[in-house]
Curated annotation (Swiss-Prot):
This is KNR4/SMI1 homolog. InterPro entries: Knr4/Smi1, Knr4/Smi1-like_dom, Knr4/Smi1-like_sf, KNR4/SMI1_regulator. Residues 35-65, 260-270 have a biased composition (Polar residues). Residues 663-686 have a biased composition (Acidic residues). Residues 400-412, 507-605, 613-662 have a biased composition (Basic and acidic residues). Belongs to the KNR4/SMI1 family. Residues 701-713 have a biased composition (Basic residues). Residues 18-129, 255-274, 400-457, 500-713 are annotated as: Disordered.
Length: 713
């Protein structure tokens, strides 16, 4: 009945709240739990009944306490002791567990602490209206804010891969993060919380590609599942270490009883053969655990303090390290997983990591395969590589010299361990089966199978990402990791294979009782010879290693000289190229000046031609004007002549009329002379007047004729 009501309340909680991870019952319990609020309590899990495992000084407590006594404690013996018991408290870092050194909030974080701190004065005098300056870390400025980095990533995804952008989840809530911290029993860094408050990872069953160049960003639920899976792996490995060392299982010691102890097919923890077999596998596996930079990450395969935030769905993870090594930093981003016996610190914090991803997107180092819907990192040469390889190569390039020195030390340690292991095997077998010189020289280090790296560190092409850097791996890692995992699965078989030589030696002893002294003497002699030959072989190997080192140094010097010569040649070529470019530039300037002069001359000629054409047009216009004036004058003269002609014709008509009138008058006068004799005097007067008029008319006609002649002329 309670389960039914719990289901109903969970459903109502999921509908009425934006929580994605938190539930009603778990949220109420998480608020009362001491997991996230406890500063001194290490990680544990009551479901596994293994809480005692993390309470002893030899368990996973390194890096999970803030008390001065716990943070300053360390096992004696240095690196050798750490390798013998890698799960001990080995965190001598001064970095605070609960707050990043770049964070404004210097107090250990607990759910609700930031909200309650608003409005309160800080003990150092920092008020809510002031801003505390952030310190530089390792000479580097603080990382950009998580919100700014996510804004750049979202902008790129929205422009270039909107389908992938749709797969990013909605923000998580404060309740989700508080419950996750309670489940993980830790306090997450502030930048991780800020990132989850922007995007709660990607959809669990979305597209195959991840937002981090094909690497999937995990949501809170998947983070909890992955963390729990790797935590169980760490517990299982701790059990194997307990069996191999044969320690007495006690609650205070953090070691558990071997479940196979006392069975007829297995050896007891104190059995010499079982101890040799287990120590061989454990030592070989521990020898493969490494970190770059040195001492930054604990030398273990898995740790509950590593919180996975992204993975490639193949067992490789990008995580924040909440249990760093003595030279590490709390909250650093590391690579760990199935293919990473050597752990790499790729960023100081999750904020730095997101800023680096955003920079890679902005530089254009990406390619989307639309056929497979995969997002790849693209090099400058156009080749596609895994982003895990890119991150690993960047770290190796930064710590190249340190890796070379450590590789040399590791080889010397492997040779010494080989000699010691041969002596232990000889004592365990009673000295009857001493290794031959050929076998001694060809036998690898105990449990290593192959050197940790297939090539010297100086031969690794870790500078150029465009090469297939995926092939640059430690060939012995897979062998060593698989050897330990095989021991975990089937320990009885391994113990049985080691027992066989001992049974054979017992049979030989039974047959040779009569010659026991001769056998012992021969065995001692063979033992001495083998020891001398082993020392000689070790010395030769050391000499050869020194010669190889000298040859490598010489090759490095020659390479440096060649690079210097090449740089000088490039500098000379650059100077010559600059001089040639300068000469060409001057020549181009001269050509431009000549072109400008020619153009100016052409413009001047064109201007002169235009002026000449203008003057010619002006002269033509003047000629036309003079012709027009002459035409107007001629027209005026013609009009005058026509007018004179019209006047002359009028005068002629008047003269004709006068002649007619005169003739008519003469006729009338003749008639009147006959009728009127008395009027002679009057007629005489009239004739005189007629003569005057005639003379006047004649003079007028003469003047008109003269004018007409002048007009014709």
């Amino acid at each position: 009945m309670n389960s039914f009501f719990n289901s109903v309340s969970d459903f109502i909680h999921s509908v009425t709240t934006p929580d994605r991870y938190a539930s009603q019952q778990r949220s109420s319990k998480a608020s009362q739990s001491a997991g996230a609020n406890s500063q001194n309590r290490p990680l544990y899990n009551n479901d596994d009944n293994q809480s005692e495992m993390y309470q002893a000084s030899s368990s996973y407590t390194g890096g999970y306490t803030n008390s001065p006594s716990a943070s300053s404690s360390n096992l004696a013996g240095g690196a050798a002791a750490d390798r013998a018991n890698p799960y001990s408290s080995r965190n001598n870092s001064t970095t605070n567990f609960s707050a990043s050194s770049t964070s404004v909030n210097k107090a250990p974080y607990a759910p609700g602490s930031r909200s309650s701190a608003i409005g309160n004065n800080d003990p150092a005098g920092v008020t809510r209206d002031s801003h505390e300056l952030q310190e530089y870390v390792d000479g580097q400025p603080p990382a950009p804010s998580v919100a700014m980095s996510w804004e750049r990533i979202d902008k790129w995804a929205d422009e270039h891969y909107p389908e992938l952008n749709d797969q990013l989840c909605y923000p998580a809530t404060a309740s989700d993060l508080n419950e996750l911290e309670a489940d993980l029993d830790c306090s997450l860094p502030l930048d991780v919380r800020d990132s989850c408050l922007i995007h709660d990872g990607q959809e669990k069953f979305g597209r195959p590609s991840g937002i981090i160049f094909g690497i999937t960003l995990l949501d809170l639920e998947t983070i909890a599942e992955e963390w729990y899976s790797w935590k169980k792996a760490a517990i299982r490995i701790n059990r194997e270490i307990a069996r191999a060392t044969g320690q007495t299982p006690t609650k205070q010691g953090g070691i558990f009883i071997n479940p196979n102890a006392g069975s007829p097919n297995s050896s007891t923890p104190g059995s010499p053969v079982a101890s040799v077999a287990r120590q061989k596998n454990i030592s070989s596996w521990l020898a493969s655990q490494d970190s770059v930079p040195e001492g930054a990450v604990q030398l273990v395969y898995a740790h509950p303090g590593w919180i996975p935030l992204a993975n490639d769905r193949a067992g490789n993870n990008i995580a924040v390290d909440l249990a760093p090594g003595k030279k590490g930093k709390w909250g650093q981003v590391i690579l760990f997983g199935r293919e990473f016996d050597r752990k790499y610190v790729v960023a100081q914090s999750w904020a730095h990591f997101l800023a680096m991803v955003a920079d890679d997107f902005d530089r254009g180092n990406w390619e989307v395969d639309h056929d497979t819907e995969e997002l790849w990192f693209k090099t400058d040469r156009g080749t596609f590589v895994s982003y895990f390889t890119v991150l690993k190569t960047r770290v190796e390039r930064q710590f190249r010299h340190q890796m070379q020195r450590r590789e040399h030390e590791r080889r010397q340690a492997a040779a010494a361990a080989q000699q010691q292991q041969q002596q232990q095997q000889h004592h365990a077998q009673g000295g009857l089966h001493s290794p031959s010189p050929q076998h001694t020289q060809s036998m690898p280090a105990p449990g290593l199978g192959k050197p940790l790296t297939s090539k010297p560190a100086q031969d690794l092409d870790i500078v150029d990402l465009n090469e297939d850097t995926a092939t640059i791996k430690d060939k012995g890692k897979a062998t060593m990791g698989s050897a330990l995992r095989k021991t975990i699965v089937d320990e009885s078989k391994t113990a049985h294979t080691i027992v066989e030589p001992l049974e054979e030696s017992e049979e030989i002893k039974g047959k040779g009782k009569g010659k026991e002294e001769d056998v012992n003497e021969a065995a001692e002699k063979a033992k001495v010879e083998a020891t001398e030959k082993t020392k000689k072989a070790a010395k030769e190997a050391a000499d050869k290693e020194a010669e190889l080192k000298k040859a490598a140094e010489k090759a490095a010097e020659e390479k440096a000289k060649a690079e210097k010569k090449a740089a000088e040649a490039r500098e000379k070529e650059e100077k010559e190229a600059k001089a040639a470019a300068k000469a060409k530039e001057e020549e181009l300037k001269k050509e431009e000046v000549a072109k400008a002069a020619a153009k100016a001359e052409e413009e001047q000629k064109a201007t002169a031609a235009a002026e000449a054409a203008k003057a010619e047009a002006k002269r033509a216009a003047e000629a036309d004007a003079s012709k027009k004036v002459e035409a107007e004058k001629a027209a005026a003269e013609e009009s005058k002549e026509s007018k004179a002609e019209s006047e002359e014709s009028k005068v002629e008509r008047d003269l004709e009329e006068l002649k007619i009138d005169e003739e008519n008058g003469n006729a009338e006068e003749a008639d009147e002379e006959a009728d009127d004799d008395d009027e002679d005097d009057e007629e005489e007067g009239d004739s005189k007047e007629g003569e005057e008029t005639k003379s006047t008319t004649a003079s007028k006609s003469k003047s008109k004729k003269k004018n007409k002649k002048k007009g014709k002329k």
